[in-house]
From Swiss-Prot:
Taxonomy, superkingdom: Bacteria
Listed Gene3D superfamilies: 3.30.70.260
Coiled-coil region list: none
Ranges of residues in domain ACT: 4-78
Species per Swiss-Prot/TrEMBL record: Corynebacterium diphtheriae (strain ATCC 700971 / NCTC 13129 / Biotype gravis)
A Pfam family this chain is assigned to: ACT_6
Record family assignment: Belongs to the UPF0237 family.
UniProt cross-references to PANTHER family, sorted A to Z: UPF0237 PROTEIN MJ1558
Name of the protein described by the UniProt record: UPF0237 protein DIP1286
Length: 89
Protein backbone atom coordinates (compact mmCIF):
# COMPACT_ATOMS: atom_id res chain seq x y z
CA UNK A 1 0.00 0.00 0.00
CA UNK A 2 1.15 3.56 -0.68
CA UNK A 3 0.59 6.51 1.63
CA UNK A 4 1.56 10.14 2.13
CA UNK A 5 2.98 11.30 5.47
CA UNK A 6 3.11 15.02 6.24
CA UNK A 7 5.29 16.40 9.03
CA UNK A 8 5.22 20.00 10.29
CA UNK A 9 6.65 21.85 13.26
CA UNK A 10 9.34 24.21 14.48
CA UNK A 11 12.71 23.31 12.95
CA UNK A 12 15.24 21.54 15.14
CA UNK A 13 17.87 18.82 14.92
CA UNK A 14 16.69 15.23 14.58
CA UNK A 15 13.27 15.52 12.95
CA UNK A 16 14.11 13.53 9.83
CA UNK A 17 16.03 10.96 11.88
CA UNK A 18 13.12 10.46 14.29
CA UNK A 19 10.51 10.04 11.55
CA UNK A 20 12.73 7.80 9.40
CA UNK A 21 13.63 5.61 12.38
CA UNK A 22 9.96 5.12 13.29
CA UNK A 23 9.17 4.28 9.66
CA UNK A 24 11.94 1.68 9.63
CA UNK A 25 10.74 0.22 12.93
CA UNK A 26 7.27 -0.21 11.42
CA UNK A 27 8.50 -1.72 8.14
CA UNK A 28 7.48 1.40 6.23
CA UNK A 29 9.67 2.15 3.20
CA UNK A 30 10.32 5.80 2.30
CA UNK A 31 10.06 6.01 -1.50
CA UNK A 32 10.44 9.76 -1.86
CA UNK A 33 10.82 12.74 0.45
CA UNK A 34 10.56 16.50 0.07
CA UNK A 35 11.37 18.87 2.90
CA UNK A 36 11.88 22.56 3.36
CA UNK A 37 12.38 25.07 6.14
CA UNK A 38 10.56 28.40 5.94
CA UNK A 39 11.26 31.03 8.59
CA UNK A 40 12.21 28.35 11.10
CA UNK A 41 9.19 26.17 10.32
CA UNK A 42 9.94 22.63 9.12
CA UNK A 43 7.71 20.88 6.58
CA UNK A 44 8.21 17.43 5.08
CA UNK A 45 6.15 15.21 2.80
CA UNK A 46 7.02 11.53 2.47
CA UNK A 47 5.70 9.09 -0.11
CA UNK A 48 5.85 5.71 1.63
CA UNK A 49 4.91 2.10 1.00
CA UNK A 50 4.23 -0.80 3.32
CA UNK A 51 2.78 -4.30 3.35
CA UNK A 52 -0.85 -3.76 4.29
CA UNK A 53 -1.07 -7.32 5.59
CA UNK A 54 1.56 -6.41 8.21
CA UNK A 55 0.34 -2.94 9.27
CA UNK A 56 -2.22 -0.28 8.39
CA UNK A 57 -2.54 3.48 8.30
CA UNK A 58 -4.22 3.69 11.71
CA UNK A 59 -1.40 1.71 13.35
CA UNK A 60 1.26 3.87 11.71
CA UNK A 61 -0.54 7.06 12.79
CA UNK A 62 -0.81 5.79 16.38
CA UNK A 63 2.87 4.81 16.40
CA UNK A 64 3.87 8.25 15.12
CA UNK A 65 2.20 9.81 18.19
CA UNK A 66 5.39 9.16 20.17
CA UNK A 67 7.44 11.01 17.56
CA UNK A 68 4.90 13.86 17.52
CA UNK A 69 5.16 14.25 21.29
CA UNK A 70 8.93 13.81 21.58
CA UNK A 71 9.71 16.13 18.65
CA UNK A 72 6.80 18.58 19.11
CA UNK A 73 5.46 17.95 15.59
CA UNK A 74 2.21 17.35 13.76
CA UNK A 75 2.36 14.14 11.71
CA UNK A 76 -0.47 12.92 9.49
CA UNK A 77 -0.67 9.87 7.25
CA UNK A 78 -3.20 9.40 4.46
CA UNK A 79 -3.70 6.73 1.83
CA UNK A 80 -2.36 7.66 -1.59
CA UNK A 81 -5.73 6.49 -2.94
CA UNK A 82 -7.31 9.66 -1.50
CA UNK A 83 -4.97 11.85 -3.54
CA UNK A 84 -5.45 9.70 -6.64
CA UNK A 85 -9.25 9.92 -6.33
CA UNK A 86 -9.15 13.72 -6.00
CA UNK A 87 -7.46 13.96 -9.41
CA UNK A 88 -9.82 11.74 -11.39
CA UNK A 89 -12.10 13.67 -13.69
Amino acid sequence: MFAIISVTGADHTGIIAAVATKCADLGVNINNVSQTIMDGYFTMILHVSFDDSATDIATIQESMADVEKDQNLVIRIQSQAIFDAMNII
